[in-house]
Curated annotation (Swiss-Prot):
UniProt record, GO biological process: acetate metabolic process
Keywords: ATP-binding, Cytoplasm, Kinase, Nucleotide-binding, Transferase
Organism: Bacillus cereus (strain B4264)
Protein name: Probable butyrate kinase
Coarse class of the protein's main subcellular location: cytoplasm
Superkingdom field: Bacteria
Molecular function GO terms recorded: acetate kinase activity; ATP binding; butyrate kinase activity
Localization of this protein: Cytoplasm
EC number(s) on file: 2.7.2.7
Gene3D superfamilies: 3.30.420.40
Length: 367
């Protein structure tokens, strides 16, 4: 089998994770920490790309990686327009939306830009894979009870789909042939209903839907939320932080560290026990609801993400949902590996690269 060498790039706010893979085998994985003062010199996140590019190339050189031997570069997908899942070739339309922050400004927007900047000089393809804006929801799933307020698909698409593919392989099936309920449990929690390779419904783990998590409030009583918003006690930014960043475990028990909470549970702390059980309860309830989306025809329930390492949490969830389908636990996440696998599927011609196309304010994915 021929060897495809792939450089993968996952930019964070103050770091850039890079990896070099020979097919599925990691040759190099490194987290480049950026000096906060250095990063702070740039007014816009997008202005950091040249600095980050040079830093990446220096690190590769220091490890003896000859970039002329690369077959492709793959970056983390950023805040683009809603698109279906898959591996996309970085093109001019995508670069424009990433640079302009079409759906928001975030360090992940640098992923596609860095991939393109490095790949174009080598005359090799640049890709992104399954960004958080992946949207495969069916029309019926978009409707909310307020006109003009559609439900949106924002979730851990990269890890959910990567793990779903691994589970399908484990079950000796193709991802596109299975119905799976995949739950990513990390700083945020999302439960996706995967129908034959498409996530037809999923809770918006960023903007207040679904289970509460270590840092996010999830679904809350809306009437009380409105009262709080107009109480005069909080600014808008403070309310946003209550939902994302200072919600969930942070609000309820003053920590986002699930390991610490689990230790409290093991010591018999009644408050910690109730709150941790409530988080598991809400996850299980979300899984139960998602099972109805797939008419109860579920091949497996999958638990993944950092919290899937928690035996207490996993056992509590299993106890409530294992009657629906077998529960498969795939803890942790490996975004670098998932990016490499997405690029590899295209290089091996197992799937065609998709094209990011903007038409009349819409994005159309073409395979």
């Amino acid at each position: 089998m021929s060897v495809n060498r792939i450089l993968v790039i996952n930019p964070g706010s103050t770091s850039t994770k890079i990896g070099v893979f020979d097919n599925e085998r990691p040759v190099l994985e490194e987290t480049i920490r950026h000096d906060v003062e250095q990063i702070g010199k740039y007014k816009r996140i997008i202005d950091q790309y040249e600095f980050r590019k040079e830093t990446i190339l220096e690190v590769l050189h220091s490890h003896g990686i000859n970039i002329s031997k690369l077959n492709a570069v793959c970056g983390r997908g950023g805040l683009l327009r809603p698109i279906e899942g898959g591996t996309y070739t970085v093109n001019d339309a995508m670069l424009e939306d990433l640079k302009n922050g079409f759906s928001g400004h975030h360090a992940s927007n640098l992923g596609g830009i860095l991939a393109y900047e490095i790949a174009s000089g080598l005359n090799i393809p640049a890709f992104i894979v399954d960004p958080v804006v992946v949207d495969e929801m069916e029309p019926v799933a978009r409707i909310s009870g307020i006109a003009g307020m559609e439900r949106k698909s924002i979730f851990h698409a990269l890890n959910q789909k990567a793990v779903a593919r691994k589970v399908a392989e484990q079950l000796n099936h193709k991802y596109e042939d299975l119905n799976l309920l995949v739950t990513h449990m990390g700083g945020g929690i999302t439960v996706g209903a995967h129908k034959k390779g498409r996530v037809i419904d999923v809770n918006n783990g960023l903007n207040g839907e679904g289970p509460f998590s270590p840092e996010r409030a999830g679904t809350v009583p809306v009437g009380q939320l409105v009262e709080m918003c107009f109480s005069g006690e909080y600014y808008r930014d403070e309310m946003i932080k209550k939902l994302v960043g200072q919600g969930g475990l942070v609000s309820l028990i003053d920590t986002n560290d699930a390991i610490k909470v689990e230790q409290m549970v093991e010591k018999g702390d009644p408050e910690a026990t109730l709150i941790y059980k409530a988080m598991a309860y809400q996850v299980a309830k979300e899984i139960g609801g998602a099972s109805a989306v797939l008419h109860g025809k579920i091949d497996a329930i999958v638990l993944t993400g950092g919290l899937a390492y928690s035996k207490i949490l996993v056992d509590e969830i299993k106890e409530r949902v294992d009657w629906i389908a077998d529960v498969i636990v795939h803890p942790g996440e490996d975004e670098l590996e998932a990016l490499a696998e997405g690029a590899l599927r295209v290089l091996r011609e197992e799937e065609a690269p998709k094209e990011y196309v903007v038409r009349e304010k819409e994005t159309v994915a073409r395979g």
